[in-house]
Amino acid sequence: MEIKDLQDYVAIVNDWPKKGIVFKDITPLMNDGEAYRFATDKIVEYAKELKIDIIVGPEARGFIIGCPVAYALGIGFAPVRKPGKLPRETIEMEYDLEYGTNKLSMHSDAIKPGQRVLITDDLLATGGTIEATIKLVEELGGIVAGCAFLIELKELEGHKKLNGYDRLILMQL
């Protein structure tokens, strides 16, 4: 398998979650063990190069990407969730979506100062989610060593919010 083959495992869904949005569905990739392992292995290789201490992923597809990477590396995973979903003290950050606004939260003790962090998510669109996640990590004293995505929607220019941050993007659609 090659990186270019991963595009065969992304389903295009028009008008979801609302009219005018073209959703990129990664569940076909997750349903295929070889494709899922290949994508995960590419991110693991990237994380090893960066000497990552912990993986951070935003709800929910960031979990799907980040948890197997953390497992493969033998390191922890820190979830970033919507407000009210984490049971202990949290910090919050507001962000813009491709189709609205929301907030993200993270346990206030999830990252130790100086930890090298890899942020994982399935998709880089407008960059709002990743920008908020970066701010949460940095507020806790973490060092964002890199960001890894399965897909970038290049026309939405989310990469502009990642200036100065290393990144791995497996597919551009």
Curated annotation (Swiss-Prot):
The record's subcellular locations are:
Cytoplasm
Cross-referenced CDD domains, in alphabetical order?
A: PRTases_typeI
Give the quaternary structure. Homodimer.
Q: Name one GO biological process term.
A: adenine salvage
Q: What is this protein called?
A: Adenine phosphoribosyltransferase
Species, as recorded: Listeria welshimeri serovar 6b (strain ATCC 35897 / DSM 20650 / CCUG 15529 / CIP 8149 / NCTC 11857 / SLCC 5334 / V8)
Name any one GO molecular function. Answer: adenine phosphoribosyltransferase activity
Q: What class of enzyme is it?
A: transferase
